[in-house]
């Protein structure tokens, strides 16, 4: 009996020692000052870690196995100087937890993607990111807060606290200008405004046929392209390709100098468009900025 009691006591002491050992947990705290934004914000805080310093981490985020590390957490009413904590409990990609990220030197950046609350006509109230002219690209959305990238020696097995300050705000996007061949239209939709409970707009980019000004009363066939959110008429370039353009490799298409190919093809299309034997018609690309 004495032996059994001794074993139980020893086991209890061992467990006590185990659980009393220091538990290291790296944390990242994200905040912004009143000088950057004085109001509270609903949205999503995004933390990015990259070993590539050729560009900001927010421009390196992509799907796939070669993705940079990213974490995200939703926030409601985040105010100035309030710290949002990202620790081992926050889900990430491609590595799921902060604790499993390999130690090393990383370029670290955080961004706060703004959400809006919509009181819809169907009775539902939802909080969603509204497009602000960028085509639902959170890393370029005007009004989003982000931090200046900083290099940090990252050690997941430490109890350090990394503080990241959102010290920048993305500027509004200038709408594209009309040209001889491309016009832009923007109207408020009564139906969408009523449904979403706030002003909603539809846009269109119009490619005019060659000779349109000389024949203002002519009727033309119409081709409508309904994609996602085109920023302007694409693949149409009146200027010749830039001879000094620095080549960029396309990972998507596995093509060298793909940016140069795009300019060449866009200018070739323009030359065909104004050619004497090319059909004359209107092209419209629809722009619908929904949440």
Residue map of PLM features:
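Non-catalytic cap/lid and distal C-terminal segments of serine-dependent acyl enzymes
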Residues: 35, 51-91, 96-291
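Beta-strand signatures of extracellular beta-sandwich domains
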Residues: 44-48
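A short, amphipathic beta-strand motif
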Residues: 28-34
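Positively charged n-region of N-terminal signal peptides that target proteins for export
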Residues: 1-4
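Boundary at the C-terminal end of the N-terminal hydrophobic targeting segment
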Residues: 23-25
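Bacterial N-terminal signal peptides
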Residues: 9-20
């Amino acid at each position: 009996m004495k032996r059994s009691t001794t074993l139980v006591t020893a086991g209890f002491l061992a467990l006590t020692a185990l659980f009393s050992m220091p538990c290291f947990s790296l944390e990242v705290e994200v905040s912004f000052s009143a000088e950057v934004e004085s109001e509270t914000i609903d949205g999503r805080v995004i933390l990015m870690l990259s070993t590539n310093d050729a560009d900001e981490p927010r421009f390196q985020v992509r799907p796939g196995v070669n993705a940079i590390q990213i974490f995200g957490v939703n926030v409601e009413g985040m105010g100035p100087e309030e710290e949002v904590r990202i620790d081992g409990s926050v889900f990430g990609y491609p590595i799921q937890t902060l604790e499993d990220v390999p130690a090393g030197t990383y370029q670290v950046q955080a961004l706060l993607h703004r959400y809006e609350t919509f009181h819809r006509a169907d009775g539902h109230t939802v909080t969603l990111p509204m497009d602000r002219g960028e085509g639902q690209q959170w890393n370029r959305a005007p009004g989003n807060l982000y931090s200046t990238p900083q290099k940090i020696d990252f050690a997941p097995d430490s109890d350090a606290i990394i503080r990241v300050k959102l010290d920048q705000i993305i500027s509004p996007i200038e709408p594209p200008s009309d040209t001889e061949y491309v016009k832009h239209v923007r109207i408020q939709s009564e139906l969408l405004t009523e449904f979403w409970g706030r002003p909603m707009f539809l846009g269109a980019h119009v490619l005019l046929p060659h000779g349109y000004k000389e024949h203002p009363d002519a009727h033309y066939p119409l081709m409508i392209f309904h994609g996602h959110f085109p920023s302007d008429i694409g693949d149409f370039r009146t200027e010749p390709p830039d001879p000094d353009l620095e080549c960029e490799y396309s990972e998507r298409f596995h093509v060298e100098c793909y940016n140069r190919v795009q300019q060449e093809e866009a200018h070739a299309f323009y030359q065909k468009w104004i050619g004497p034997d090319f059909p004359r018609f209107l092209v419209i690309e629809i722009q619908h900025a929904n949440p």
